[in-house]
């Protein structure tokens, strides 16, 4: 026997002193701390199919989907693994068998750690896949074989590496599908026909399988919970509403009904009951189904008189302006501890703060319950066509073939500094490989304080910005976010971000002092200007959105344009404050060239002149 052969034989001898060690931590205990949705979810999703069938594409899309819904997972890709763990293996039958065995063992460890492990390997031979299944089953771990099925000609047409062409030319030997067989699975858990289905459809087929097997909660598949009465039940519910006692609600309350009914506050089914209210007040989250970010209370205040009148009723109608809007069911009344609420949400109880003033003047009781909303809330102000629901926004993005959606929340007119940030974000997304990034320009449309520019004027100004080409109309959606404004700084900015996440945004631009305002008495910033961005980067439950920090933009006097501020060239920049901008507009003067699109500036001056006339 040669020395090399002898050494190889000796290395293959198994040690007799190796004993498998049992973990001290159980899978259930591990599942409690892995991810933000409690429960052990460890399993392996084994994607098999020809090269070019779509395994890697589906694997990474499934990974992105699960992570965005707080399900911990990891994708093992065939090419990636051969760069490291299996770099010493070739493509002989023996090496292929060992490649799959190693992957199965690694996948088992990932699954045992509580992750959904997604593997994307050709794995052409049935016996190797069966061995991978046995490795998992012997460890008591679920294993799901997914056949990614695409005709050979389709796979060849997708072959960006040119491997099929080289195999047909004889340059690559033993290539699966050409001169090496692929043994199709006989009884896979799912078959994905990638020539007939979209990537999204394939992902949802796998998610449905994981739900059926109790790996993924059913609650995550329906991302948006609308509270409208189904059309086939509407007549019956309307008739019922006519027989019920009613509670008159304010315009502010109606705005919150709109927010709830359209699904912006998913998974809330109505105004918060005390349990939900306490979770939000003390943890900034809802905790009944994992950790769901919810930083602001969405509550319905009522007077002591209305509480006395209605507390014996399990259900009653909410009415506004004499119109029955919704039925509130399984009502629960609890004390409205206003000072505590304001302290926790705003960090102050100063009644000169405009929203705190409204809270302090509202009812002494809160009522929570499930809502059945009779119809979509419309304001008939000429702007309803911009009030797109989360589902409508998702559909709009789908029609635009968006592969990234970046949201910009605003309650002020758009100047070229804002536009620079949005343009720069789009540029960065394109550099990262996205093909069709879409901007969601999403002005807040609910209640705002008296000195803010009203919604109708802001919408005219935004339209002028698009008309002048400062932002690209073809890749921009302008829609109205129906929420009232709280001016609650870092607490509120989480709500702004999370609601856009619900609507499909996966990038969120956060600015300086988001949702902030000057302290009503000291006139200094009520919140530290950088805290909003810092809090968003740490906030729990915002797993499917990436925070894009707001770079400081100012007017560059040399360039005569808005530019990103460089402290080394401080003297070149002019910081044009909102106060100065409003003063110029009131006096009919123009700002420096390049500060704002001329047509957009004219809208602003027209608004302030209208105030002077009135």
From Swiss-Prot:
Residues 224-614 are annotated as: Sulfate adenylyltransferase. The keyword Membrane does not apply. ATP 2 binds at residues 409-412, 511-515, 553. Its EC number is 2.7.7.4, 2.7.1.25. Keywords: ATP-binding, Disease variant, Dwarfism, Kinase, Multifunctional enzyme, Nucleotide-binding, Nucleotidyltransferase, Transferase. InterPro entries: APS_kinase (IPR002891), ATP-Sase_PUA-like_dom (IPR025980), P-loop_NTPase (IPR027417), PUA-like_sf (IPR015947), Rossmann-like_a/b/a_fold (IPR014729), Sulfurylase_cat_dom (IPR024951), Sulphate_adenylyltransferase (IPR002650). ATP 1 binds at residues 52-57, 197. GO terms for cellular component: cytosol; nucleus. GO terms for molecular function: adenylylsulfate kinase activity; ATP binding; nucleotidyltransferase activity; sulfate adenylyltransferase (ATP) activity. Adenosine 5'-phosphosulfate binds at residues 79-82, 91, 96-99, 122-123, 161, 174-175. Expressed in cartilage and adrenal gland. Bifunctional enzyme with both ATP sulfurylase and APS kinase activity, which mediates two steps in the sulfate activation pathway. The first step is the transfer of a sulfate group to ATP to yield adenosine 5'-phosphosulfate (APS), and the second step is the transfer of a phosphate group from ATP to APS yielding 3'-phosphoadenylylsulfate/PAPS, the activated sulfate donor used by sulfotransferases. In mammals, PAPS is the sole source of sulfate while APS appears to only be an intermediate in the sulfate-activation pathway. It is linked to Brachyolmia type 4 with mild epiphyseal and metaphyseal changes: A form of brachyolmia, a clinically and genetically heterogeneous skeletal dysplasia primarily affecting the spine and characterized by a short trunk, short stature, and platyspondyly. BCYM4 is an autosomal recessive form with mild epiphyseal and metaphyseal changes. Clinical features include short stature evidenced at birth, short and bowed lower limbs, mild brachydactyly, kyphoscoliosis, abnormal gait, enlarged knee joints. In the N-terminal section; belongs to the APS kinase family. This is Bifunctional 3'-phosphoadenosine 5'-phosphosulfate synthase 2.
């Amino acid at each position: 026997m040669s020395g090399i052969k002898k050494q190889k034989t000796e290395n293959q001898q198994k040690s007799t002193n190796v004993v498998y060690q049992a973990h001290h931590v159980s899978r259930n205990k591990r599942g409690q701390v892995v991810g933000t949705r409690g429960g052990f979810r460890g399993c392996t999703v084994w994607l098999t199919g020809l090269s070019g069938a779509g395994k890697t594409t589906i694997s990474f899309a499934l990974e992105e989907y699960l992570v965005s819904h707080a399900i911990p997972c990891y994708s093992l890709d065939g090419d990636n693994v051969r760069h490291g763990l299996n770099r010493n293996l070739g493509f002989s039958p023996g090496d292929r068998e060992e490649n799959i065995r190693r992957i199965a063992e690694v996948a088992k460890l990932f699954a045992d750690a509580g992750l959904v492990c997604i593997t994307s390997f050709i794995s052409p031979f049935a016996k190797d896949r069966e061995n991978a299944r046995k490795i998992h089953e012997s460890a008591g771990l679920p294993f799901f074989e997914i056949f990614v099925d695409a005709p050979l000609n389709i796979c060849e047409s997708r072959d960006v590496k040119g491997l099929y062409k080289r195999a047909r030319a004889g340059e690559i030997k033993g290539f699966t599908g050409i001169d090496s067989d692929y043994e199709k699975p006989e009884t896979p858990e799912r078959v994905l026909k990638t020539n007939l289905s979209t990537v999204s459809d394939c992902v949802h087929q796998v998610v449905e399988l994981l739900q059926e097997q109790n790996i993924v909660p059913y609650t995550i598949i329906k991302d948006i919970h609308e509270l409208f009465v189904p059309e086939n039940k509407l007549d019956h519910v309307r008739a019922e509403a006519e027989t019920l006692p009613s509670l008159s609600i304010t315009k502010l309350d109606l705005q919150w009904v709109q927010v709830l009914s359209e699904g912006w506050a998913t998974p809330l089914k109505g105004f918060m009951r005390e349990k939900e209210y306490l979770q939000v007040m003390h943890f900034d989250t809802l905790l009944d189904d994992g950790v769901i970010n919810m930083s602001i209370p969405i509550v319905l205040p009522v007077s002591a008189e209305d509480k006395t009148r209605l507390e014996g009723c399990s259900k009653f109608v909410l009415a506004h302006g004499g119109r029955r809007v919704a039925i509130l069911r399984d009502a629960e009344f609890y004390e409205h501890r206003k000072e505590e609420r304001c302290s926790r949400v705003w960090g102050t109880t100063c009644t000169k703060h405009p929203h705190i003033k409204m809270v302090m003047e509202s009812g002494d009781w809160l009522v929570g319950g499930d809502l059945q909303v009779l119809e979509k809330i419309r304001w008939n102000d000429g702007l309803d066509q911009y009030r797109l629901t989360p589902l409508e926004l998702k559909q709009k993005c789908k029609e635009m073939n968006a592969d990234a959606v970046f949201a910009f929340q605003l309650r002020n007119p758009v100047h070229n500094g804002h536009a620079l940030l949005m343009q720069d974000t789009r540029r960065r997304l394109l550099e990262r490989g996205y093909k069709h990034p879409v901007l969601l320009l999403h002005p807040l449309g609910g209640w705002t304080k008296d000195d803010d520019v009203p919604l109708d004027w802001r919408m005219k100004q935004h339209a002028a910005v698009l008309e002048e080409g400062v932002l690209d109309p073809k890749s921009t959606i302008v829609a109205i976010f129906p929420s009232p404004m709280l001016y609650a700084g870092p607490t509120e900015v989480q709500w702004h971000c999370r609601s856009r996440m619900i609507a499909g945004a996966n990038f969120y631009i956060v600015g300086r002092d988001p949702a902030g305002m000057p302290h009503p008495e000291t006139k200094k910033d009520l919140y530290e200007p950088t805290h909003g961005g810092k809090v968003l980067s740490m906030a729990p439950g915002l797993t499917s959105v990436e925070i894009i920090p707001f770079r400081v933009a100012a007017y560059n006097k040399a360039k005569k344009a808005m530019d990103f501020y460089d402290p080394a060239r401080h003297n070149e920049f002019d910081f044009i404050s909102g106060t100065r901008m409003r003063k110029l507009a009131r006096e009919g003067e123009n700002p420096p060239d390049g500060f704002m699109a001329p047509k957009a500036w004219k809208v602003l001056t027209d608004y302030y002149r209208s105030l002077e006339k009135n």
